[in-house]
């Protein structure tokens, strides 16, 4: 094992659950369930791959503990025994591939969509979420029903073979709505003070312990803070929630962040490293049980956090989406083999905004692990790939990994194509990590790289390949101008190292690329 990452690979424990390392696949909406909430082969393949790649703990995405608590189309369901066979198969494939298996339980509350459930949303108070209808305020009877539902779903998870359960009281889900003053305006014993707003969490753990006993690990995920939320959870409140959770009998706490605007919850390329770590560290000082932290963390950052004693477990969500083999590669001393997450948020855009199954711009095999499993070529062939952008780099790498003899031809002097251009934008320098990954992997897999070469048809014929793959990109659209010399495509402007002096520049369009270009040009002028 590489000593550089020694803390990352120390064994850990949550309650009675021994875990081989400190790397956790956190629960994330993947959209791989069926429309009626059943586990699918696609879901099993996804989770099995992350377990096989070396994660110590795999937590399955939020499943619905209460009938009708659905926020998204492909939401897993654990509200009835009819879902037990699929849940059992899912827990089994995770454990059979070397990881501990847990599942998250989460109800949408006021975020429930009537179009999916046929019923009105419910919440602690009749306060509508953004772009949602006004929820019905839950009665005391409704709260008791919800409490029983969470407890029964936890028991169902235990019966299915899961080794732990996480109660989802973070982001914008039902339980987080009770914790936040912004969504909980109740005047009874479930509203007002920190202890009152946390009361439902005490009720849930008490009801759960009656069914699963004291040895089954149950922990909680909360918002360490709520951004852009008047009356939202503060750090002082989350520290108190953590103390109350430990006193109530939860076995650990996982720290995330919340906001009615997902952009503030999901960390982007522009987010500073370890954004939530100081919050987790402050909470850790208040409790003695384990603290888990998330937020665009990779192996290097995770090692730093553990070494500093700022958390006990590292949740690597998108990092493990991009490369399920991250833990084993790092443990073997080959971090350069880890495919980095470019943080372009196509995953979030698909899952949260479009409500379709998640895909990854860096990992085409995400959610298709079995379908896209690489097989050795029956007969190695000579392959020429034209184009050194991401598509060409991936094509060259995959064909080489299968055993073919590959030559990559790129017209420019550098590889990366549009991604390299995008990496010039302010705040997007980390995109170069994906290009660097490809360069290293192509060299390791024996790909011959020709840069500064314009691949003509005659040139390709002269190379006598068995197969030619064209990945030369597309032509950029350019706005018409009276003087054609004054009209430049966004990508060309990004590619220029300097801007001519003494000229006025107009950027036409207000999309992300245009704004980034304007920002970049102000640095050069």
Predicted features along the sequence, with ranges:
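Flavin-dependent oxidoreductase catalytic cores
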Residues: 1-386, 390, 394-406, 414, ...
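Short loop/edge segments at beta-strand edges and connector loops
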Residues: 295, 413, 435, 451-454, ...
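A short helix-to-beta-strand connector/capping loop
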Residues: 310, 442-449, 483-486
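Rossmann-like dinucleotide/flavin-binding elements
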Residues: 380-408, 450-458, 464, 472-482, ...
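N-terminal Rossmann-like dinucleotide/flavin-binding domain of flavoprotein oxidoreductases
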Residues: 417-463
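N-terminal Rossmann-like NAD(P) cofactor-binding module of classical short-chain dehydrogenase/reductase
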Residues: 469
